[in-house]
Amino acid sequence: MNNQKNFLIVAIFLSVFLLWDKWGVTHVVGANGNLISQTKIKDASTINNSLTNKNLNASSIIHRNAELDLPNTITKNQAPFTTVVTDLLTLEISHKGGTIQNAWLNDYPIEINSEQKFQLLSNKADEIFQAQSGLLPQGQTPTHHSIFSSKNSHYQMDGNSLVVPFTWKSENGIKVIKRYHFNKNSYVIGIDYQITNTTNNTLNITSYTQLVRNALDQSNMIIPTYTGGARFDDQDVYEKIEFEDFNDQPKTTSKGGWIAMIEHYFFVAAIPDVNQIHTYSSKIINGEYLLTVVNPELVIAPGAIVTLPSSSLYIGPKEQKQINNVAPGLDKTVDYGVLFIIAKPLSELLNWIYSIIHSWGYSIITLTLLIKLAFYKLSEKSYRSMAGMRQLAPRLTKLKETYGDDKQKLGQKTMELYKKEKINPASGCLPILVQIPVFISLYWVLLEMVELRQAPFWYLTDLSAQDPYYILPLIMGVSMFAQQKLNPPPPDPMQAKIMMALPFVFTIFFLWFPSGLVLYWVVNNILSITQQWVINKRING
């Protein structure tokens, strides 16, 4: 099996993979890795919760079925806001609804050496992305439209935790304290409500959280990353929801679960109480996209003071060390594609290597070397087949000259030659096919790892960005050309011209690839050339 056929195998496999991966975007992934086709049902006009009874404290508080009409109008926050600064986050929380209207990630500058931090949540008109939450029914309790008060306009985390309260009072004696809970070294924000019912009537309460954003797509043709919604349920089913499908999704119920708005490297997730049954929905309003989770309705007795079950928000990067223990299935927001079963162990191995080496560039090189060692025997078989074919090239050319007009005779004589020399031209196929899924998986690992964002290596300042001097793509092109020279030229002149052009085509294509990916390809090519050269030398004596 010569190298030219290997290139064709890679091209065909990549085409099939990209089609499969695109199909997988609109399908559901179960915990066992099975793909479950998504049934689209028109969004209902009401939310029906089927709930179980549960005492929250000594007062008479029970779950009951509820039909709710959420205040869906999206409003731009013009109210005063309170600034909250933790070790990882800087937030602006509007007094209108207690909505987190702006969020910056302190450890992630927008550019290298920039004082400006990456902004994930925003109240800018053309970049709306907010986390809204509130209580229902509207009028009796505060929604994300209601005006809260805050004792301070600025909170700074000085210890290991911080609580930021917002207060709302009704005219008839209902008091609500909405509290945000922050912990050091965490992007998780807890939310709870303390409700005081001083009226003579029972109070029917339902809490909700919704994520709102526009459909700003941050992906491109060279780097195809996912931007859109997602949800996870108690059946361990993870489902992507593309923006154009928001109005077509059915309402679902789940014990626990979560919803999220995802983009490259970062995401925001709303995570309700794991012990309750919640209703999830999505919709499009005025060109903006909403993912909503509604919690069970509660009946609060007159005179009772109750704290509702807490929920959480995750506002931050797709760091595995941060998200692994936040909620079940949250690690699926790191999009490894359809080969996640292979990609996730590779990601964990790469992180483990980094914990020892403390350099992402050298970690990629080390991982490439380990993968090459793991497939050494398979690669050796392929390269031996190539070397054997190279030795037979003059004799095959002579057979073609002799029997060129008789295709049947040429095929017969060619097979006799293979049999005599004990060479199977197809023996190199299996090693290549086995290694391709690993290459594709590592591609997605390096593409999705936020840890590579702005990670330096030698002259490179950011392994997630293209090589600014195009050194690695040029080395990659040269290595491909050198690898071709180790193999016999194709007998067909047209095929030979195509193969000669491939290094130039790939070089141009890789100019815009993240340098971390190109680094992997270059190292892999150099190791392959070395291995093939050694094998050729042994065979040729």
From Swiss-Prot:
Keyword Cell inner membrane attributed: yes
UniProt subcellular location: Cell inner membrane
Entry keyword Transcription: no
Keywords: Cell inner membrane, Cell membrane, Chaperone, Membrane, Protein transport, Transmembrane, Transmembrane helix, Transport
A Pfam family it matches: 60KD_IMP
Biological process (GO), any one: protein transport
TM helices/strands, residue ranges: 7-27, 289-309, 356-376, 430-450, 463-483, 498-518
Gene Ontology molecular function: membrane insertase activity
Membrane topology note: Multi-pass membrane protein
Gene Ontology terms: cellular component: plasma membrane
Subunit structure: Interacts with the Sec translocase complex via SecD. Specifically interacts with transmembrane segments of nascent integral membrane proteins during membrane integration.
Family: Belongs to the OXA1/ALB3/YidC family. Type 1 subfamily.
Cross-referenced NCBIfam families: PRK01318.1-3, yidC_nterm, yidC_oxa1_cterm
Function: Required for the insertion and/or proper folding and/or complex formation of integral membrane proteins into the membrane. Involved in integration of membrane proteins that insert both dependently and independently of the Sec translocase complex, as well as at least some lipoproteins. Aids folding of multispanning membrane proteins.
Name under which the protein is recorded: Membrane protein insertase YidC
Species lineage: Bacteria, Pseudomonadati, Pseudomonadota, Gammaproteobacteria, Candidatus Pseudothioglobaceae
